[in-house]
Each structure stands twice: as C-alpha cells, then as structure tokens.
A protein has these predicted regions:
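Short, helix-capping/interhelical loops that line the mouth of catalytic, cofactor-
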Residues: 2-48, 96-136, 197
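Short, contiguous, helix-prone interaction/anchoring segments in small proteins
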Residues: 33-72
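Short helix/strand-capping connector loops at secondary-structure junctions
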Residues: 33-40, 121, 158-171
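Acidic/histidine-rich alpha-helical segments that form the ligand environment
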Residues: 52-65, 100, 116-156, 174
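Helix-loop segments that flank and shape redox-cofactor active sites
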Residues: 58-84, 106-112, 148-168, 194
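Histidine-centered active-site/metal-ligand motif
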Residues: 89, 161, 179, 183
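A hydrophobic membrane-anchoring alpha-helix module
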Residues: 180-192
Length: 197
C-alpha cells in the first residue's frame, strides 16, 4: 500500500468489510465488489455494518474538518461538482440507501417507486460546519433505520440503482459504506494535493 492509501489501513481496522468490498473498485475488479458485498452482508450483520458506517462517517468528517475554507469550492472529484456538493451528496446517499433497505425490510416499500437517480449533488455552498453536521445526521438516520434491517439482511430490496442494480437489504447497508470510501478517496487525494502546494 502506498502512502496515498495510508488512511485505508487505519480505517480497515474499524470497517474491515466495507474496505474489503471497496478494494475491488480501487483495483479495477468491479465484479468482485458485488461478490464481497454479498459475502459480507448475511444474516446478523446489520448492526456490525452500522458500526462500520460510523467509522466511515467519522473518517469523512475528519477530512472535511481539516480542509481549508477555500477547498469547499474546489473540484470535488465527481464530474463538475465542488467539494461541498460531493460531501453533501455522500451524506444524502448514505442515509437514503439505508432508509430504502429499512423500508423494504419492514415491508413498507412504496408502490411505484422510481429507480434511483444517481449523481445528485449536495448544495454548492455547503460549509465545513454544515457538512460535518449533515454527515452526523446521516449516521443518526442510519442507526435508527438499520434496526428494521436486523434479521432481514437477506431480504430482497426493490431499490433499483442504474449503476448497481438490485441488492438485498443488508447489502445496501454495506454498499453505502463502499460509496463513502469512493468519495473519501477523492477527498484524501484533494487534501494531499493541497498539502503539496
């Protein structure tokens, strides 16, 4: 592992399943991601995955807290979004995926729900404090919503994502963490680039 990925080793101790699934994306082995997500999302894993999602939320918040003020208007690594938009997107996505899993697990899925629209940015003017607050709020939503998934991790979830397809309820929890790491990598790369200036 290069210095570019030093942060991964620290996070892996607290979020081993999420990091293991994410490594497939980082290494260009995309089919392995789905396999790892499925393998690590079986019955009885929801509460452990929530603890791992808390670790990824903390890691995201740590990077956001260290960025200089001007960084939030810089490119955020996702299309033409700035950092504030990318972090806002992460906060909304992580809680939204877990909420969807909880609705399916509780047999409360709304009929006629359209497919997910990926790539919706957060507000462009997000501030450090506001983004950290949104990440904290997303984790609280996850902790409440995931209780419904406990014992239903292998239940089908009708959530349709055009890039991911369909996953089981517990798999969406773990995938929320993989998505966190995709953006966390972008933030670490930006932070390192700013440090070299």
């Amino acid at each position: 592992m290069t210095d570019r990925y030093a942060w991964v080793g620290a996070l892996e101790r607290e979020a081993p399943d999420i990091v293991a699934a994410w490594r497939g994306i980082d290494e260009g082995r995309f089919l392995s991601v789905r396999r790892e997500v499925r393998r690590r999302s079986g019955t009885g894993t929801a509460l452990g995955t929530v603890a791992q999602l808390a670790a990824t939320a903390d890691a995201l918040s740590d990077v956001v807290e260290r960025l200089p003020d001007h960084a939030f208007a810089l490119p955020g690594g996702e299309g033409d979004w700035n950092v504030a938009e990318a972090v806002g997107h992460v906060a909304t996505s992580r809680s939204g995926l877990v909420l969807a899993a909880s609705l399916a697990a509780g047999d409360r899925w709304p009929p006629g729900t359209p497919a997910v629209l990926p790539g919706i940015p957060g507000p462009a003017t997000g501030t450090r404090d506001g983004l950290v607050r949104r990440l904290d709020q997303s984790q609280r939503v996850i902790e409440r919503a995931a209780r419904a998934v406990e014992g239903h991790e292998r239940d089908a979830c009708p959530l349709e994502h055009p890039l991911v397809g369909r996953l089981r309820c517990g798999e969406w929890l773990l995938f929320a963490g993989v998505h966190d790491l995709m953006h966390l990598e972008q933030l670490h790369d930006l932070s390192a680039a700013l440090a070299r200036q």
